[in-house]
Amino acid sequence: MGASVQERDRTRLVLKQSIKNAVLSHQKVAEAINDDVVENISSIIEQIINALKKDGTIFWCGNGGSAAQANHLSAEMVGGMFKEKNEPLKSLCLNVDTSFITAWSNDNSFNSIFTRQIQSLSSKNDIVIMLSTSGNSENLILAADYCKQNNVTVVSFTGNDGGKLISLSDYNIHIKSDCTQRIQEMHILIGHIICAEVENYFK
């Protein structure tokens, strides 16, 4: 037999409370974005604008859900966020070339998939934006270290304690949370803000 009306009602109440808790958790993390974080976001926007004015490229990369967000935000820069037909901005996501990534990972190392592409594609006016909830992904650490040694600007979005990536970054957005979902929600929010403000500048 199916659940009784009372059981279904109880299940629905539990579900509603769970949804409310998730929203409240999101709000709490969002409200922790203080003036220091806003200052960092402003600096990153200025750096991206300066890079694009010098014909630089904005590269994005990440792993897992952060890879999806990197792809999303790169697409926002190329395609534009608004209805106006603005000029496309030079942006490329480094985790979408499946042929290269699978070949290089199979024959060499997954840890160097981003470093290799940055070696091939980057120049002094470029910026590499790395998204990582932990800040400890080895392929990002190695890529950031390469950038540091070769004067390529690194911007990182991190969470948890920031990991090793913070010290290798020229600019960092750190979300003080240990919940992966909340961290990624803030990353995409801030990424959208950055893309929108950069696009507005070049209207």
How should these model regions be labeled?
Residues 36-54:
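A short, well-structured juxtamembrane/interface segment
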Residues 66-203:
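Glycine-rich phosphate-binding loops that contact phosphosugars or nucleotide phosphates
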Residues 58-59, 154:
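Hydrophobic beta-strand scaffold residues
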Residues 1-36:
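Generic N-terminal amphipathic, Lys/Arg-enriched alpha-helix
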Residues 29, 54-55, 124, 168:
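Structured helix-beta-strand junction loops
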